[in-house]
């Protein structure tokens, strides 16, 4: 039995869950999410809990059991609380500004980078060096944060670049040089 898959998912009062055929739809105060479920996985609602079970007991179905339980749990949490990732820009002259539905980055290059904010994602700027990516879909929030970080990955000598707030950059010592 999957350690993650066997755990029930508690449904909050503000969340409405609908299961039809191989689709599960979760609706809450922040929005609505849907997910297609593999036919080898059964999902049912009992006593205000979502139960995820396997139809078969082969290797692939055992792998899907925990996966779909986690996906459904993230859907329920996303429509009720939402997800957030924070990024920080380090470096002299490095900054970001928002104009409409786009972010413009100055990252030490001769041109600005433009990043168009995808639908369903909210971005808050705190000053011009802090970025908060928010949304109801955990996967999309993480993907957008990773795309923004990839514009200028932190380098190990001075730590210049875009990093997650909880990320620790492994630093290297610079050249020592030979004295004459």
UniProtKB/Swiss-Prot annotation:
Protein name: Large ribosomal subunit protein uL6
Family: Belongs to the universal ribosomal protein uL6 family.
InterPro entries in the record: Ribosomal_uL6-like, Ribosomal_uL6-like_a/b-dom_sf, Ribosomal_uL6_a/b-dom, Ribosomal_uL6_bac-type, Ribosomal_uL6_CS
Keyword rRNA-binding: yes
Subunit structure: Part of the 50S ribosomal subunit.
Organism domain of life: Bacteria
Keywords annotated in UniProt: Ribonucleoprotein, Ribosomal protein, RNA-binding, rRNA-binding
Cited PROSITE patterns: RIBOSOMAL_L6_1 (PS00525)
């Amino acid at each position: 039995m999957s350690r993650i898959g066997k755990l029930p998912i508690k449904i909050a009062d503000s969340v409405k869950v609908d299961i039809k055929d191989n689709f599960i739809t979760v609706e809450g105060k922040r929005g609505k999410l849907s997910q297609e479920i593999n036919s080898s996985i059964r999902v049912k609602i009992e006593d205000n809990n979502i139960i995820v079970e396997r139809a078969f007991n082969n290797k692939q179905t055992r792998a899907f059991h925990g996966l779909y339980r986690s996906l459904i749990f993230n859907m329920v949490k996303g429509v009720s609380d939402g997800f957030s990732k924070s990024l920080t820009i380090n470096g002299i002259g490095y900054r970001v500004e928002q104009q409409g539905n786009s972010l413009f980055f100055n990252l030490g290059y001769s041109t600005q980078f433009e990043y168009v904010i995808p639908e369903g994602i909210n971005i808050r700027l705190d000053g011009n060096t802090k970025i908060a990516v928010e949304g109801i879909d955990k996967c999309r929030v993480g993907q957008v944060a990773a795309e923004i970080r990839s514009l200028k990955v932190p380098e190990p000598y001075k730590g210049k670049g875009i990093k997650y707030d909880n990320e620790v950059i492994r630093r290297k010592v610079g050249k020592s040089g030979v004295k004459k």
